[in-house]
């Protein structure tokens, strides 16, 4: 198995685990990147990008990163907050008056970021391809009735998060979510990362290999149960196979359609690990990063995912569910002030401010879970161990 790229000798453990993912854990094509104090110390890739065409995973290969996109979308909202243009504690209707229908008038922007708004799905089935029609999706969300009283429960907004937060970004900035992200994050940082992929980049996109669903897991059982919030998740005009298509890549789905690689995802988080700036590019300030790091919502049972979750205004926090019963063990083991987001099947990106480290892993063979699996976690573990950290079964990294 050939691994390409570069790795600082101090982080050789990451390179070793990356190779083991291919040799022992079924990896097909992937990339991993780590930055320390804004400098890249790991930038590796390898494997096959498209098993049907037998194309190699190249240096510039990119792939859909599913819910890692939520981190990019949340960052856009935080940028507007840092600039004084968006009050995260304000009601959504301050910026989006039409949203205040059907019992949603008191929902705040903070509730959207915390997955507490109760608009975790759309009950009415939408026509195929609706996910690519922003106005249609926004109108459907304006009409939707909350599944629970807003602010009283935490329930992961698997797809609706992107349109809800993205529309706030659009109303405040005057730009679409994808354009705002390009103008304020991707282009200033010089990264290959799109929410709404240009057609000329399409040949570089790796083809995802979907995992068999965990049919015995409680979350998947609920998908098959009529009239549950889980059963309505894909009432957005497309299933996962359609999201990983040209039309899905082109759509600005702020919860799921981001296209990048580990290099781009890690570099997006690099300034967030370093006080808000990378070189001459200032993204946010230290106070904003503290808000990103602080746990703002947590629950013993997420109303949608049915597992314990912890969030920090749009970002996932470290959560150790490994001792939970079978089917409830979705986990991400990070340092305590780290924040980021995992993507369905195993991709992940995060910032660890104490360590001044950013990390990202992307791949095309999806695992069955909705957070990281043994491939991603082994790389995360190796990065922390390279910095001299140790972990115990409590999931706490110590040095």
Predicted regions and their residues:
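A short, polar/charged loop-to-alpha-helix boundary motif
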Residues: 50-60, 368-380
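Active-site-proximal alpha-helical segments within enzyme catalytic domains
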Residues: 115, 161-168, 252, 256-278, ...
């Amino acid at each position: 198995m050939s691994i390409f790229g570069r790795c600082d000798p101090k982080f050789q453990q990451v390179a070793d685990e990356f190779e083991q993912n291919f040799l022992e854990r079924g990896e097909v094509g992937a990339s991993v990147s780590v930055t320390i104090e804004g400098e890249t110390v790991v930038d590796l890739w390898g494997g096959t990008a498209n098993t049907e065409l037998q194309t190699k995973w190249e240096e510039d290969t990119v792939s859909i990163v599913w819910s890692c996109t939520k981190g990019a979308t949340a960052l856009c909202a935080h940028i507007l907050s840092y600039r004084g243009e968006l009050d995260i504690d304000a009601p959504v209707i301050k910026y989006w008056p039409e949203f205040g229908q059907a019992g949603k008038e008191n929902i705040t922007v903070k509730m959207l970021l915390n997955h507490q708004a109760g608009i975790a799905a759309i009950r009415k089935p939408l026509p195929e391809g609706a996910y690519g029609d922003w106005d249609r999706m926004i109108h459907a969300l304006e009409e939707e009735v909350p599944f629970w009283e807003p602010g009283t429960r935490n329930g992961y907004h698997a797809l609706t998060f992107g349109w809800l937060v993205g529309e706030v970004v659009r109303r405040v900035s005057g730009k679409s979510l994808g354009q705002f992200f390009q103008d304020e994050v991707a282009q200033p940082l010089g990264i290959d990362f799109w929410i709404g992929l240009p057609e000329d980049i399409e040949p570089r996109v790796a083809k995802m290999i979907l995992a068999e669903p965990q049919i015995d897991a409680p979350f998947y059982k609920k998908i098959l149960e009529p009239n549950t919030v889980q059963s309505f998740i894909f009432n957005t005009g497309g299933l996962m196979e359609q999201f990983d298509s040209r039309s899905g890549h082109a759509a600005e789905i702020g919860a799921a359609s981001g296209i990048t690689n580990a290099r781009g995802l890690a570099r997006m988080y690099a300034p967030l690990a370093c006080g808000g700036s990378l070189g001459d590019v200032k993204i946010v300030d230290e106070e904003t990063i503290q808000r990103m790091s602080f746990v703002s919502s947590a629950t013993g049972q997420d109303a949608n995912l049915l597992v314990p979750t912890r969030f920090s205004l749009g970002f996932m926090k470290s959560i150790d569910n490994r001792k939970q019963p079978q089917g409830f063990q979705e986990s991400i083991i990070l340092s305590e002030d780290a924040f980021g987001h995992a993507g369905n099947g195993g991709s992940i990106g995060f910032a660890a401010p104490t360590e001044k480290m950013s990390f990202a892993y992307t791949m095309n063979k999806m695992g069955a879970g909705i957070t990281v699996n043994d491939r991603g976690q082994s790389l995360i573990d190796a990065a922390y161990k390279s910095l001299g950290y140790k972990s115990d079964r409590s999931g706490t990294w110590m040095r």
